[in-house]
Regions:
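N-terminal glycine-rich phosphate/pyrophosphate-binding loop and immediately adjacent elements
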Residues: 1-120
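Helix C-cap/helix->beta junction micro-motif
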Residues: 6-8, 221, 251
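Flexible loop/turn segments at secondary-structure boundaries
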Residues: 19-21, 177-180, 233-235, 264-267
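Beta-strand segments within the central parallel beta-sheet cores of soluble alpha/beta enzyme folds
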Residues: 62, 168-174, 215, 227-233, ...
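Rossmann-like flavin
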Residues: 75-184
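Helical element adjacent to the flavin cofactor pocket in flavoenzyme catalytic cores
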Residues: 190-247
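Core beta-strand elements of the Rossmann-like FAD/NAD(P) dinucleotide-binding domain
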Residues: 245-255, 259-260
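Flavin (primarily FAD) binding-site architecture
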Residues: 258-275
């Protein structure tokens, strides 16, 4: 969207038949259901993207804010709703797990906000996070380093924070956001709780509608989308242009942006030149 808005001739090659990648819908007996992400957080990031290209998110997708951020069940019958209203979340924790757990949850929430405030710009909003950009933010509040709990995994850190194991289990799920295990993921992922507490939205028609909205906006700006396009390799020619092998044909371009798993490049899945 940004490139097309800037006057660049953009062609998107997508292996699947529809936009969105993992953000897709599949048919079921109850109708279409999300098969990837089911809700959206950090709505301002998407609003800012559309504004940058002279558009409005609301014109391309309908987002509806949820009062219940997440509902949790345990086999013993315990249920916990984390809410859009922070005080309601605190009261729900107190009701389900007691006063001590509520106090621990309150401190955890404060620490998650501190981590978010420190690392949002240099890490979460950066396409290429770098330690040199994080250090100045950390120096503004040196105690944040201890809050990061850098020597412990997410599971270890949560085990120390919560005397109630079910709360530790609940927040350990953030490891799945990066495809990791709680025992092997950094404690820093605790900041995701603050991201969720800022608001959770669902997209009318399913999350895939956001992808379709972004596609429509990009098309209006001049971008071209080619689906069922399987790129198997690319290399840079003597002229400086890149040659992409796609569906047994070669396409020429000035630059390549790869939006897949970086490990695929490192392992040579798109040819030795790409790795």
């Amino acid at each position: 969207m940004r490139l097309a808005h800037g006057g660049v001739k953009v062609t998107v090659l997508e292996r699947q038949a529809t936009p969105g990648g993992k953000m897709r819908s599949l048919p079921s007996a109850a109708g279409m259901i999300d098969a990837g992400p089911t809700v959206l957080t950090m709505k301002p990031v998407f609003e800012a993207l559309f504004r940058e290209v002279g558009c409005q998110l609301a014109d391309y997708a309908t987002l509806i804010q949820e009062d219940i951020l997440a509902r949790h069940f345990w086999r013993d019958g315990t249920r916990l709703d984390l809410m859009r209203d922070p005080q309601a979340s605190l009261e729900n924790v107190r009701h389900s797990f007691g006063t001590a757990a509520a106090d621990e949850f309150c401190k955890f929430s404060r620490d998650a906000q501190r981590l978010f405030d420190t690392l949002n710009e240099p890490m979460m909003q950066s396409a290429t996070p770098a330690l040199r950009r994080m250090i100045p933010e950390m120096l503004k509040s040196p105690s944040t380093v201890m809050t990061m709990d850098p020597l412990r995994s997410l599971a270890q850190s949560l085990g120390r924070r919560f005397s109630e194991p079910r709360l530790a289990q609940l927040f350990a799920r953030y490891a799945t956001y990066v495809g990791g295990l709680p025992q092997a993921s950094p404690a820093l992922l605790a900041l995701i709780w603050h991201v969720e507490s800022l608001g959770v939205w669902h997209v009318k028609g399913g999350m895939s509608q956001l992808a379709y909205g972004m596609e429509a906006c990009a098309k209006n700006l001049g971008a071209e989308f080619r689906y069922d396009s399987y790129v198997t390799g690319f290399e840079r020619g003597k002229s400086g242009k890149y040659q992409l092998e796609c569906n047994d044909r070669f396409l020429s371009c000035d630059a390549v942006l790869f939006n897949g798993d970086p490990n695929a490049l490192a392992r040579g899945f798109l040819g030795p030149a790409a790795s």
